[in-house]
Structures are given as structure tokens and as C-alpha cells.
Amino acid sequence: MAEALPPRSPPDDVDIDPDFGPQSRPRSCTWPLQRLDSQGSPGKPNSGAGEAADTSSMIPEEEDDDYEGAASTATVLGTAGDKGTLVLLSGGESGQLAVLASPVGGVETLQVSLGGEGAGGAVSGAGGQQQQRKCSSRRNAWGNMSYADLITRAIESTQDKRLTLSQIYDWMVRSVPYFKDKGDSNSSAGWKNSIRHNLSLHSRFIRVQNEGSGKSSWWMINPEGGKGGKAPRRRAVSMDNSNKYTKSRGRAAKKKASLQASSDATDDSPSQLSKWPGSPTSRSSDKLDTWTDFRSRTNSNASTISGRLSPIPATTELDDVQDDDSPLSPMLYNSPGSLSPSISKPCTVEMPRITDMAETMNLNDGLPENLMDDLLDDISLTSSQQSSPGVLMQRSSSFTYGTKGSGIGSPSNNFNNTGSFNFPLTSLRQSPMQTIQENKQATFSSMNHYSNQSLQDLLNTDTLSHSDVLMTQSDPLMSQASTAVTAQNSRRNIILRNDPMMSFAAQPNQGGNLVNQNSLHQQQSLNSFQGGSRALSNNLSNTGLNDSSILESTKHQQQSSVSHSMQTISDTLSGSLYSSGVTLPTLGHEKFPTDLDLDIFNGSLECDMETIIRNDLMDADGLDFNFDTLISAQNVSLSVGSFTGAKQTSSQSWVPG
């Protein structure tokens, strides 16, 4: 296309390519669309060259700007008379442009016909002379110069070698003919955006803060000489092209391997608990402190101190463990005497804690009788201080209450001279069973540690409901029976209810266990109480009533007669016999001191506690126990610390069974 310019000096000494005619392109952006007349020159087009240009090669896409091999040059090709024409073109490999000065009108007519790669350009003047040239296809609509080249020339054309963004826009519109008619806001959006991108992405341009306030920054050429062309295009970070995730996966694998190695190394230590697979403490040592804080809650389905999901004995796992390697699992004793009430220290906080946990455990699934038989055969409670710390409370087939440190007893029914008291446990009938496995040694304290007020608190509190089974360390101190009472009864339906809590007092320095297990009894006749030469001791009063209403219920039960004859029980109860309306008299301190000197009992004392508990306490039809007199007389009670439950007297009537 030929373009006539007024005869004036070129701005900034930059040659402008007059060949801005429409080009054949597969797409259109801000570049001119393809027209039928490919030669948009105001002069007469060359039809032959136009035909060639109409089907000539497409303008290729803008290549990467790392093309520094072909230096762009701007050359003033010539003038005709006092008229001049600026031609801006790229100095390609064989690019040649012949300018024929026209003698007519002083205006040069420049026509370039672009063919394929290496096609010659025919330049025709007014005289029709033509000259061919070889050149490559143009990279852009305004020529082969890129935006970066134009920006560079714009900045270098100034005296201060710096321009603002708006000044660069003005230079483009003023110096490059292609942008002359694209200076308005509607048509300048595309190329101005390209200018901004090139300024930001090219390392050859730097931005300098303008000293004036509220003014745009200066754009300058990088004095350090940035690399030519655009910077590599940045890609969005993904899991495919980023090594961040690879590094994180590697760190995680290394950490896991180190933890595994440390865990394997600590397994060899006898103090580690990883050999206990059922214990939550079978972890690495760095996590041991955290887990032991709440292991008793997380390892039980009832949120109690029980370390197992059910009272089913787990002797298979524990038999292989040495006694000195006792775990921190709450189902085992920590030490022979640790945290256990002793003679010198009253039990102040143990009782409420156990009672609270007793309420939380409620196994409502009925268990078959044969399963309960197996369970009870494995239960063993011993107060021996010589027992190993790892002894489970579920081992033997009898409860042993010893005053001389007796060991695990056999299921016998005799009460020997040493004061040990053995009675068999029979199966519980299919009923909701609740159990507590205490993790401390269960011992008894002497009677003088407790006061009447604390016993009243125990009787008035409702924390021990009649449906709870309690295995506790409290000392309601029912004295050891010294009568010779035997009965013919099968090993079934022993009922240790927690409402009349039965406990057995040993000597002040000895220990025993109190077991209250709630199970519904099966009605079975008891033949008779036989024999009897000794007395039930003076502390039958403290049967551990949980509800104050038991006093009324026992009085209510006296209206029916005792179905089985009871023989002489004691010669120390002031001649009182167990019969209808028997009231236990107040005993003098001179004969039965509060420390229960058991040496006053002579001979062999035999007692079938199953019969006593079953018949006298649970089915006592005609017994009237007067507890108030003995409580005041003996000053025997429990010191239970501070119960968590509210102290209120229940008015409900307790009915056994």
C-alpha cells in the first residue's frame, strides 16, 4: 500500500513502513480484516501483484521474541526532491527494498508484493519500473518488529531514556502508522494491553518510581542488560510440574520410617507396653504420656476404670506376662499397696470415685447362666499384701476375706480359726450385670476413722442406686459372723446387692474386700439354718444401706413369718435370737471394743454366708433390725469423702428381687 506523507522531518528519526494493507489471515484481532481488494493503497493498485497477494501465504503467528539473530533496522530509503518518505522495515536475511523516486508530484509510490517464503517484492514507480526483493513473512501487522522492539525504540528516542506508560502509548500512535487510527479507547484496548504485558514480562524493562506524587512510574531500559526476548511463560502450579508435592511425600515417608524404627527399637525394652495388644498404651514412647492420661475412658465401652469391654476374664492374654512387667492398663493393680486405704490413712475419696464410676457402667445385655458360671469361677478377690501387682481380680472361684493375710482360698464353707472367711460364688441368673474392676488394692481401715455424720451422708445419698453393682473399698463393717450356721443350698443365686452393702471387718491392720453385685435371684427354697453356737458379732448394723428407705422396707418385711427355723446364733447378743421381731441390742464397749478383737472368739466358726445373705437379709420376712441404736453405740460409720451426687433422701421402697 502506498501512503503519502507530508514533507516533514520524521518523528524521532524512525522509518515507517507504508505497507499497512490488509493481509490474508486466518483470524482477526485488532488487525485489519481481509478485503477483496488486497491492495488498499490510495494509489492505483497493481492488479498482477494483487492477485498474487490475494492467495499469498498467511501471516504466521507471533513467534517467541528470542529472535535476536535478525536485527531490526529502520532506514530512511530516500527522498524525492523536497518530498520524503519514511519506510520502516526489518533487515531480514535477504530483505531488499527498492525505492523509485517519482518525478511527478514529488510523491513516492511504494508498492510491495509479498509472496511466499523468499518471494520477490516488486516495486513499481510511476514509470512502471519494478524491482524484486527477497524477504520473510512479516511477524506483525506493522512489520517485523515486536512490541518489545517498539517499546525499546520509544524509550531510547527520549533524552532521559525513560517514559511513562501513557507516553509510550502516545509514541506508538504518533510514530507507528498502524496505530495512528487506533488511539481512541475503543480500538486501543488490545494493543495497549499488549504493551503492558511486554513491559511486565520482559526483563529488559525496569520500572522506576516517579519522584512526583500521584504520577506514573517511569519505564526504562534495564542497564544491566536483561536477556533478550520475553521471559519464559509461567505455568500454573500443578501436581505434575511442581516438586513441592514430591518433597512433601518424601518427608512423610521418611518420618514414617523413623517412627517405625523408633517403635521397633523400643519394643525390646521390658518397660514398654507395646506387647499388650489390648492396651491403648501399646504405642511409641513419645505418645505414651498423652494416651495414659485418658486411657481408662477410651478403652472401655462404659467409660469406667475397666480396661475391657466386658467382665469376661481375659486370662489368655495376661497369663504370659511376668509379674514384674505389669502394664498401665487399669484392670491390673499398679503396686501392692499403692493408693489403697490403709490403717494409717482413712478412705476419703476412693468411695465417691468408685460409686460415680459404678453408675456409668451398665451392661444391659443378659448373660446366660453357663457364661456367668464361668465368669464367677474366675473371679477372685484377695486382700493378701503378698499378692503380686499383676494379679487380676478375676482368677479364682471364691472370695477370700482373710485377717491373717490368707491367700486365695478354695470354695469351702468353713470359717477357720484364723478368721478367713470363704464362701462359694454361684451363677447369676440372666439379668443385667454390672461390674467394676478396681485398679487398686482393696483393704479395710479400722472403724475409728469414720463418724456418724459420714454414715448418714452415705445413707442419704442417691449416688448408689439399687441397680448398681459396687465393688468398693468402703467399710460399712459388718462384723464377721461367728455362728455355726450351715445350710443345704446349691451354688446358685447368691445375691450381693448393693443396697444392703455387705462388708466384713477384719483386724485393723488387715484388709478385705467388699463385693456388691446386683443380680436378680431365682426363687429357691432353703432347707433350714442348722446348728449355731456362736454369735453374730456386734457390727451387723452397718450393712451399707444405700437408701434410707431400707429401714422402712425391712420393717415391712417382718409381717411375714420366717419360713425356716433359725437356731441359736449367739450367746453374746444378750440372749437375743433370730426370730420374728428381733432387735439387735446395743452392745457394750467393754466386751466388744471398736477395733474388733477377734481373739475373744474361740473354737471353729462356720458360716454359710450364702444362706445368711440369701435368706436373712434379702428374704428376711420377720426380721426387724434396729440400726439406730448400734450406730449411736458403736460410733461406726464410713468416711466417704465428698460424694458427687446430691444428698437427698429417697422415699421409694426398696423391694428385693
Swiss-Prot record:
Provenance organism: Xenopus laevis (African clawed frog)
GO molecular function: chromatin DNA binding; DNA-binding transcription activator activity, RNA polymerase II-specific; DNA-binding transcription factor activity; DNA-binding transcription factor activity, RNA polymerase II-specific; protein kinase binding; RNA polymerase II cis-regulatory region sequence-specific DNA binding; sequence-specific DNA binding
Protein's UniProt name: Forkhead box protein O3
UniProt tissue specificity: Localized to the animal hemisphere during early cleavage stages. At the late neurula, localized in the anterior neural plate, neural crest cells and in the hatching gland. As development progresses, expression becomes less localized, being observed in a variety of organs and tissues including the head, branchial arches and somites by stage 32.
Key words of the record: Activator, Apoptosis, Cytoplasm, DNA-binding, Nucleus, Phosphoprotein, Transcription, Transcription regulation
Residue spans of biased composition, Basic residues class: 246-257
Disulfide-bonded cysteines: none
Function: Transcriptional activator that recognizes and binds to the DNA sequence 5'-[AG]TAAA[TC]A-3' and regulates different processes, such as apoptosis and autophagy. Acts as a positive regulator of autophagy in skeletal muscle: in starved cells, enters the nucleus following dephosphorylation and binds the promoters of autophagy genes, thereby activating their expression, resulting in proteolysis of skeletal muscle proteins. Triggers apoptosis in the absence of survival factors, including neuronal cell death upon oxidative stress.
GO cellular component, as recorded: cytoplasm; cytosol; mitochondrial matrix; nucleus
InterPro entries named among the record's database cross-references: Fork_head_dom, FOXO-TAD, FOXO_KIX-bd, TF_fork_head_CS_2, WH-like_DNA-bd_sf, WH_DNA-bd_sf
Basic and acidic residues bias (residue ranges): 284-296
Recorded coiled-coil stretches: none
